Structures are given as structure tokens and as C-alpha cells.
Amino acid sequence: MEIRVFRQEDFEEVITLWERCDLLRPWNDPEMDIERKMNHDVSLFLVAEVNGEVVGTVMGGYDGHRGSAYYLGVHPEFRGRGIANALLNRLEKKLIARGCPKIQINVPEDNDMVLGMYERLGYEHADVLSLGKRLIEDEEY
């Protein structure tokens, strides 16, 4: 397995992977999300590749105060092999190298499998309520 930075030629393969991982939401256009990331620190957008196939992704961010991780997904046939752990570990190292003191990940409360993975990796529940406001409406995907 190789972990590397997203490249333009990964575009369609990544969107297909996100569909298989059930990461897409009607209010988020994944093509726009990728375009936005490519214009803003693409070095934190990582893919895991096995035999030339993109099998995992994580899209990281850092605002100078806190890091974040989105679109963490691993192809169903490749789960249980440590790919998600490796992607998060690489992202964390990149964030630490930038002086990032902490990382935040939003997870649906009912996603027990993923919550367990994050807890095993040292992530803790934060007693905060996450609020959001859409500033630019994407077309329904």
C-alpha cells in the first residue's frame, strides 16, 4: 500500500470510492469539494493506493488553530487491513509538522463501528455540539 497526495487523475476514482463508502450527501457536491480542496492545500488530501487502485482517502485541513479530517473512507473489500489507521496517522504527522496542536473529526452519533475505531486511535468524545451554516449552496448531487 502506498499513501500519497491526491492527484487530478484520481478525481473520478475517488468519487466512485466515496459512493461505495456511503460518504456522499445530497447537499455536498463531491466534485466541488475536490475542486475546492485542490485550490486550498491539496497536500492534506491523501489517498491510499493498492496495486494502482485508490482504496482509501482522507481530506485534511488546518486553520492555524485546529486540524480536521473529512472523507475518511476505505473501499469495503479492503477494510480491516489498517488502511484507515494509516491514512489518519499520515495526516496527523503532516499536521504535527505544521505545529497543529489538535485535530477534530465529526462522526454521526449512530456510527458505532467508526466511533470504535477512532476511540482505539486515541480520539475522545468532546462535550461540544457541532453547528454548521452553509455559506455557498452546492447543487444537489
Curated annotation (Swiss-Prot):
<keyword id="KW-0808">Transferase</keyword>
<dbReference type="InterPro" id="IPR016181">
    <property type="entry name" value="Acyl_CoA_acyltransferase"/>
</dbReference>
<feature type="domain" description="N-acetyltransferase">
    <location>
        <begin position="1"/>
        <end position="141"/>
    </location>
</feature>
<dbReference type="InterPro" id="IPR023072">
    <property type="entry name" value="Acetyltransferase_YpeA"/>
</dbReference>
<dbReference type="GO" id="GO:0016747">
    <property type="term" value="F:acyltransferase activity, transferring groups other than amino-acyl groups"/>
</dbReference>
<protein>
    <recommendedName>
        <fullName>Acetyltransferase YpeA</fullName>
        <ecNumber>2.3.1.-</ecNumber>
    </recommendedName>
</protein>
<comment type="similarity">
    <text>Belongs to the acetyltransferase family. YpeA subfamily.</text>
</comment>
<dbReference type="Pfam" id="PF00583">
    <property type="entry name" value="Acetyltransf_1"/>
</dbReference>
<dbReference type="InterPro" id="IPR050832">
    <property type="entry name" value="Bact_Acetyltransf"/>
</dbReference>
<dbReference type="InterPro" id="IPR000182">
    <property type="entry name" value="GNAT_dom"/>
</dbReference>
<keyword id="KW-0012">Acyltransferase</keyword>
